[in-house]
Amino acid sequence: MQKEVTKPIEIPANISLNNLQDLFPPHFGNEEADEDDEDGDKYGDDDGEFYGDNDGDNDGDNDGVNDGVGDGPPSTLL
């Protein structure tokens, strides 16, 4: 099999993850894996979401928990 030669792409430092998918063509990645993808979305993800996210949420979500630690003086309300 002939290997395709590609050049590296430059990713701007200020790009958001939402726009990252715009940098890659639809067939970017392992095309052999596309044959096993039942719905043809090209990334091995089973619901049409992006890059292997199979439950429709964003894999990069933080947990939303704030530990409450700050730089101020200790509370006197106890």
From Swiss-Prot:
Residues 20-78 are annotated as: Disordered. This is Putative uncharacterized protein DDB_G0283069. The lineage of its organism: Eukaryota, Amoebozoa, Evosea, Eumycetozoa, Dictyostelia. Residues 31-64 have a biased composition (Acidic residues). It comes from Dictyostelium discoideum. It comes from the Eukaryota.
